[in-house]
């Protein structure tokens, strides 16, 4: 997990690399450290190891080096996931989603096996002003999920479709 709250969810290791973490991005050292963490988890004999990444897996803008997702890139290289579940926002542009899918499908040998559509609208200004996120109506989410699934050929989940998502993950790893 990349968040301290990961321990609340049973994470075996925490590598904070989000906003204000203080972890500098020294790629080689980061990759070695995370790879050692992965090994310490692997020797416990789990069938599946879940890894969470910070948002913005690819940059929205190249106008500021602070927007480059270098830590996320290093973490992907260090963990080499077999499968990805890409979480997207309702308002994310389809070309951005497509770039993210292409990136994840090419950086390591893994592939995007599912998309999870976040059911709240949070614009940047509202986030800065600490406003509550707004629920997106289920029929709008459903239509967007169908559209994304059709466009990308990847199952799309939203709301409480956790059992279907788990089934997709299990089927992927049973192949």
Model-predicted regions and their roles:
Residues 1-175:
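Flexible phosphate-sensing "switch/lid" loops adjacent to ATP/NTP-binding sites
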């Amino acid at each position: 997990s990349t968040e301290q709250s990961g321990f609340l969810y049973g994470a075996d290791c925490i590598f904070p690399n989000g906003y204000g973490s203080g972890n500098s991005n020294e790629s080689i050292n980061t990759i070695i450290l995370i790879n050692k963490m992965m090994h310490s988890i692997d020797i416990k004999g789990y069938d599946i190891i879940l890894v969470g990444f910070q948002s913005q897996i690819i940059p929205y803008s190249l106008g500021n080096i602070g927007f480059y997702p270098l830590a996320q890139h290093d973490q992907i290289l260090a963990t080499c996931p077999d499968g990805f579940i890409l979480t997207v926002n309702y308002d994310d542009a389809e070309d951005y989603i497509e770039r993210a899918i292409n990136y994840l499908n090419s950086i390591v040998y893994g592939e995007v096996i599912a998309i999870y559509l976040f059911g709240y609208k949070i614009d940047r200004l509202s986030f800065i002003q600490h406003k509550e996120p707004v629920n997106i109506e289920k029929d709008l989410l459903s239509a967007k999920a169908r559209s994304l699934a059709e466009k990308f050929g990847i199952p799309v989940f939203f709301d409480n479709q956790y059992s279907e998502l788990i089934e997709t993950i299990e089927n992927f790893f049973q192949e």
